Amino acid sequence: MATSLGSNTYNRQNWEDADFPILCQTCLGENPYIRMTKEKYGKECKICARPFTVFRWCPGVRMRFKKTEVCQTCSKLKNVCQTCLLDLEYGLPIQVRDAGLSFKDDMPKSDVNKEYYTQNMEREISNSDGTRPVGMLGKATSTSDMLLKLARTTPYYKRNRPHICSFWVKGECKRGEECPYRHEKPTDPDDPLADQNIKDRYYGINDPVADKLLKRASTMPRLDPPEDKTITTLYVGGLGDTITETDLRNHFYQFGEIRTVTVVQRQQCAFIQFATRQAAEVAAEKSFNKLIVNGRRLNVKWGRSQAARGKEKEKDGTTDSGIKLEPVPGLPGALPPPPAAEEEASANYFNLPPSGPPAVVNIALPPPPGIAPPPPPGFGPHLFHPMGPPPPFMRAPGPIHYPSQDPQRMGAHAGKHSSP
């Protein structure tokens, strides 16, 4: 590319000659005393391809040298830093900022249209005071809650660290502690954050950092209005002892007519009832997760109807003050239903198995005195004497479970061992 002022390839009247760059606090560094080099028409802008003044500096000790990447005209059009291309107000990528402000800036990308657009914007910048952005961004006056939650308010100086030493990754670095690069394990090459393009970041398309922040914003808690359209009450918790009913009225009156304000000092909460559902929805949207009264952050939720609160308490086992009750240990389970009237006579309350008549056990008694005992089996005639049922006092109560129940146990009959 020809860089002489006499060449007609580019409009040399629009070459940039600046005295100081447009930088964010992170890129500038934490050291207030820095030495910065200035190279007039050193490189061409990576967006508009026009030569501009390049600044180079070191943001701190053990940090890498940084330089400006885009011209000041492109920086002012998007209100971004000339080095990192992040928004100067929120510290966020352009794609996240545009999504939060709900607008899309369609800048031309062809060479001729881009040059014409840049010249018109430079004319608009020269007619302004230079304190506010121009173009579509200057017309966006409303702020977004998502941007306030995702905004990076403090500098992150670790972003200025040196790059990873490629020789150390291969195990060939011989500098040791004198190596100006980092000796750390590199990130996964398949990680989307490892592949970033400066043009994609400037135009707000296919930015992996912006996609990560937008996914985080989508998972943030939200306060959805209840399905019951009759609910117009908001719950405000965490009042403390310093916030009064007047303070709450002074904040919520801007959203609509307030019907009642009930402050419960014991629970340090309040219930604000609006006259219309629309006013309650606007108040909930504007106050959720960002209500601060007298230096105290308050919690805002939708109120619930009495029927819904009663059902939830019965289901969860909670008291009126919100204390969850623990189950009492050792209590029996649910009792079975009582038996019918005709089954009461035969009801088995102890779940015992049905028992039949008591078993009869034939016990061989010793012969009376003076009578010889019968011969052992096999030595005498086989005689069968039918025996009648034993008397009631000789019947066994049932099967034997313990040794002491055995009638043949030694010592069970005193007459067996007595002499005749």
From Swiss-Prot:
Subunit structure: Component of the pre-catalytic and catalytic spliceosome complexes. Component of the postcatalytic spliceosome P complex. Interacts with PDCD6; the interaction induces translocation of PDCD6 in the cytoplasm. Interacts with PPIL1.
GO molecular function: calcium-dependent protein binding; pre-mRNA binding; U6 snRNA binding; zinc ion binding
Superkingdom of source: Eukaryota
Zinc finger (C3H1-type): 159-186
Family the UniProt entry places it in: Belongs to the SLT11 family.
Record-annotated membrane-spanning stretches: none
Matches recorded under CDD domains: RRM_RBM22
Region annotation Disordered: where it falls in the sequence: 303-343, 371-420
Name under which the protein is recorded: Pre-mRNA-splicing factor RBM22
InterPro entries registered for this protein in UniProt: Cwc2/Slt11, Nucleotide-bd_a/b_plait_sf, RBD_domain_sf, RRM_dom, STL11/RBM22-like_N, Znf_CCCH, Znf_CCCH_sf
Protein's gene: Rbm22
PTM sites of type N6-acetyllysine: K212
GO biological process: one example: positive regulation of protein import into nucleus
Domain description: The C-terminal RRM domain and the zinc finger motif are necessary for RNA-binding.
Cross-link Glycyl lysine isopeptide (Lys-Gly) (interchain with G-Cter in SUMO2), sequence positions: K139, K149, K290
Modified residues (Phosphoserine): S4, S102
Organism: Rattus norvegicus (Rat)
Chief location: nucleus
Coiled coil (residue ranges): none
Residue stretches making up the RRM domain: 232-305
Any one of the GO CC terms: Prp19 complex
Role of this protein: Required for pre-mRNA splicing as component of the activated spliceosome. Involved in the first step of pre-mRNA splicing. Binds directly to the internal stem-loop (ISL) domain of the U6 snRNA and to the pre-mRNA intron near the 5' splice site during the activation and catalytic phases of the spliceosome cycle. Involved in both translocations of the nuclear SLU7 to the cytoplasm and the cytosolic calcium-binding protein PDCD6 to the nucleus upon cellular stress responses.
Cellular localisation: Nucleus; Cytoplasm
Alphabetic keyword roster: Acetylation, Cytoplasm, Isopeptide bond, Metal-binding, mRNA processing, mRNA splicing, Nucleus, Phosphoprotein, RNA-binding, Spliceosome, Transport, Ubl conjugation, Zinc, Zinc-finger
Compositional bias annotation for Basic and acidic residues: 309-318
Residue numbers of N-acetylalanine PTMs: A2
